[in-house]
Amino acid sequence: MPVNNFGFLATLLFVAVPMLFLIGLYIQTNSNKS
């Protein structure tokens, strides 16, 4: 199943944005605890 550039970019953003958000929260909570 070939994936066009728009579909690939949309999937990448759909996965990357929440992951960056969760990583940011994780780092924030860790820095607050220490």
From Swiss-Prot:
Any GO CC annotation of this UniProt entry: plasma membrane-derived thylakoid membrane
Keywords annotated in UniProt: Membrane, Photosynthesis, Photosystem II, Reaction center, Thylakoid, Transmembrane, Transmembrane helix
Cytoplasm as UniProt keyword: no
Membrane disposition: Single-pass membrane protein
Predominant subcellular localization, coarse grouping: membrane
Protein name, UniProt field: Photosystem II reaction center protein M
Subunit structure: PSII is composed of 1 copy each of membrane proteins PsbA, PsbB, PsbC, PsbD, PsbE, PsbF, PsbH, PsbI, PsbJ, PsbK, PsbL, PsbM, PsbT, PsbX, PsbY, Psb30/Ycf12, peripheral proteins PsbO, CyanoQ (PsbQ), PsbU, PsbV and a large number of cofactors. It forms dimeric complexes.
Family that this chain belongs to: Belongs to the PsbM family.
Originating gene: psbM
Transmembrane segments: 7-27
Domain of life from the UniProt record: Bacteria
GO biological processes: photosynthesis, light reaction
UniProt organism field: Prochlorococcus marinus (strain MIT 9313)
Subcellular location: Cellular thylakoid membrane
InterPro entries in alphabetical order: PSII_PsbM, PSII_PsbM_sf
